[in-house]
């Protein structure tokens, strides 16, 4: 347990990962600790490789892979005892202990009781038992599949930031006997696992509205700060790479005009004071509130758009708001392609919010923040694209000023989500970018 200092306070920093997987036994935790501490274990006589048919895996489809085992020994045969495959999801923070939120394992082979078809040709009878013996200079390809239970949280997908990392690893572990000695060979490879979200549930996410602080008209009218902002989003879930459509209503109760409107998209990382180990495990399982233990907040502006009435490239044709007038507009701001909201950390979380402020060149009159959730565009299942296409037929009008089209059907929806999902699917994905 290490200590790190912020101001005059000291906080505990544990290097040991916190395991929040559901129904993880003591033996399972020891296996996870061993996998993280020793991701690769090499031997001279056995070569092991992991191959996957796709760089991205979804929760519904599971993980399909190929395990290639080669006996490099020139003399000895190897007797296989067990073959296991593990999938581990780790969320790391720069100043907090890492969190293991996903841990799945499957036995490909277990003695003579679980034997895949590809190894039946290598079975030999020894006494009353059967053994799997691989001769020297032989190579065996063993396919495997790992399925995700319904209750398992797979996280937001691979995310790499300066302070936070979400990574997924596939481990293959083999125990074998060679020359009357038990040996272990392990291989590790990074993969990407994404949740599967249907278009219907994505589009049916509830709308959200935030209102700025109610101004005191008697006191603030003379101070030129009697303004009120009302911001509404048609839904709370948005895809990475999509344009967020926000409806903004500005009530100017002051005697001065408003000439500037700013939209800023922020990523906020909230750190919590890590409690004791037992309390930490209880909080992770029960999803208890951690607002009382907040110790740090860091915000970074990802996108910024400033609308000025005297700017030539004003695509909204906004001329400002005169004194004692009310104005309503619809603005758009683009989400970066690789952003996602992260809530699987035990001592931290990453959220996003949109900040709208109004004012003049010299000062800001009022501001409001509205939170929302960002989902990876690859998580959206495109098997039901007719959900988008049928709703897109409802409008044939071009959006003014070259902006994305917004359709109102029950909730106001932006169907730039389909194009964002298609673009991410057609773009070559690099795991180690």
Swiss-Prot record:
InterPro entries: Arrestin-like_C, Arrestin_C-like, Arrestin_domain-protein, Ig_E-set. GO terms for cellular component: cytoplasm; cytosol; plasma membrane. Gene3D superfamilies: 2.60.40.640. It comes from the Eukaryota. SUPFAM superfamilies: E set domains. Pfam families: Arrestin_C. GO terms for molecular function: calcium ion binding; protein-macromolecule adaptor activity; ubiquitin protein ligase binding. GO terms for biological process: ubiquitin-dependent endocytosis. Belongs to the arrestin family. This is Uncharacterized protein C557.05. It comes from Schizosaccharomyces pombe (strain 972 / ATCC 24843) (Fission yeast). The lineage of its organism: Eukaryota, Fungi, Dikarya, Ascomycota, Taphrinomycotina.
